[in-house]
Amino acid sequence: MTPRYFKEYLARYTYAKDGSWCYEDGCVYRGLALLHDQQPQEIWRDELLRLIGPQVGEDGALAGYTQDEFNIDHILAGRVLFFLEKPAPGAHWSLAIEHLAGQLTRHPRTDGGNYWHKKRYPQQVWLDGLYMGLPFQIEYGLSRNRPDLVDDALAQLNRALDLTHVAATGLYAHAIDEARAQDWADPQTGLSRAHWARALGWLAMALVDVTGLIGPEKAASSGLPERASALLTRIAALARPQSGLWLQVIDQPELSGNYEESSASAMFAYALMKAARLGLGHQFAAPGLKALASLETTQLYAGDDGIVRLQNVCEMAGLGGFGSRLRDGSPAYYLSEPLRPDDHKGTGALMMAYAERLASASAEARRAAS
């Protein structure tokens, strides 16, 4: 049922930002690339080319994108450009990569050395941004023989983990304001208040992706495997006992109105299964598999129009002013954000998790045969 859902979703696909380059489409693109790696005979790469083709000009210009916006979110979709560059090199893919890498060379940094989340969010580091920017920088550094960029990305990731870790919960805050200037930031620590599941999902995926990219030796020296294992152990413990999914405000099951959120659950499923495949802990496979199966059986269903969609996906959440809203980072705030079936972030993450289940099964079959 799940591959059929993906194909029907792609057939009715609408760009997240009217065709402008953005991370939301990038989540789906990343999912398609991973699906192609496991099922090269399928339509996934053709669909990716159909969707991304109109967004990348012959000169590498990206639709609606400007470097000087300094939005770290815009970097994420660039990861798929490395995938497209490998089997069929095209100058425009490489030129587009350079446009995005050029942003990072000039992107503002906090006083501590981390990328600002966005130009309009000065001195702020969000967990979301760790996934949006740092794996791309590592892939760029590895493919362009720039070990300095790999080391810088690893230093940023470890520094962000140090800054956002909350010892009392064993989790990480959604964001830190190093300037201690934002209303949502604790005046002493600079941290936001509540633990939003999808923010932790972005982080979990960043940790396993980076660990996989840099290889066992460098991963061991970076300390990331231990940090990933500690986080995923805590995440696995917070899964709801019956469904195996995770709550929007992940550590507050008693909170009225809290609900099982699909995008974060798919991200955790992906991260847990990949962690097991990478050798970070065999115990992570079972909760990852359970979560994906639960998403497939309980969150993929038809609405009144008869179309099967991924349900219970939080459309967006953030911190600080956004239009007329003041997003204060409280548990109540995260529960106030609307749900959007088939949101790109949810379906993209589900594609990643489904592909990872295939990758993990293939790896296990190879081990059994050896």
Segments predicted by a language model, with ranges:
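CBM-like carbohydrate-recognition segments
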Residues: 1-26, 33-34, 38, 43-45, ...
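Long, well-ordered core segments of solenoidal/helical folds
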Residues: 1-17, 46-63, 95-114, 147-173, ...
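His/Met- and acidic-residue-enriched segments that coordinate or traffic transition-metal cofactors
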Residues: 9-19, 160-163, 169-177, 182-192, ...
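Inter-helical turn/loop segments and adjacent helix faces that build the functional surface
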Residues: 39, 88, 140-151, 210-222, ...
